[in-house]
Amino acid sequence: MIDEINVDARQRMEKSVLALRGQFTKIRTGRAHPSLLDSIMVPYYGAPTPLKQLANVIAEDSRTLALTVFDKSAAQAVEKAIMQSDLGLNPMSAGTVIRIPMPALTEERRKDLIRVVRNEAEGGRVAVRNIRRDANGDIKELLKEKEISEDDAHRGEDAIQKLTDEFVKQIDDILAAKETELMEV
């Protein structure tokens, strides 16, 4: 039973770390990366459609993204959606190809982004700790119902704590890498 709780906690913690990685990819670093545009929705025939369903996005070089729009009639809507996003990008259209130069980040903007990244990481840590709390609560419930011994309960809580420490360290490592990436000029 403790093993099941442990496996469940591990899976939930892995999902939290994955979600954090996903949030970090959306934070612009001044380097062109196709996943930067993943969150953009384009109004297409009256329905909000993910940008990656309407265009092929590639990194032309380290500072330019190139989009090849599949449907020429959607090119203007794609360009407008990119401009209206909160990413601060200014696309240039040439027919069905839209080029997006990545503006260099100012020192102030870098510091703001680092603050945002740290807040996101703290949110990830809190999520992992909440999972630990839930798992420990499940273990205490089993102990209360006399389904496990006190020794088993302590071993289970220790295992959950080790798991928590492992995932918090992963989050800290991801944060350090992102901060380094943001501070590169």
From Swiss-Prot:
It is found in: Cytoplasm. GO terms for cellular component: cytosol. Keywords: Cytoplasm, Protein biosynthesis. The keyword Cytoplasm applies. PANTHER family: MITOCHONDRIAL RIBOSOME RECYCLING FACTOR PSEUDO 1, RIBOSOME RECYCLING FACTOR. Pfam families: RRF (PF01765). Responsible for the release of ribosomes from messenger RNA at the termination of protein biosynthesis. May increase the efficiency of translation by recycling ribosomes from one round of translation to another. Signal peptide: none annotated. This is Ribosome-recycling factor. Belongs to the RRF family. One of its GO terms (molecular function) is ribosomal large subunit binding. Its main location: cytoplasm. The gene is frr. The lineage of its organism: Bacteria, Pseudomonadati, Pseudomonadota, Gammaproteobacteria, Alteromonadales. GO terms for biological process: cytoplasmic translational termination.
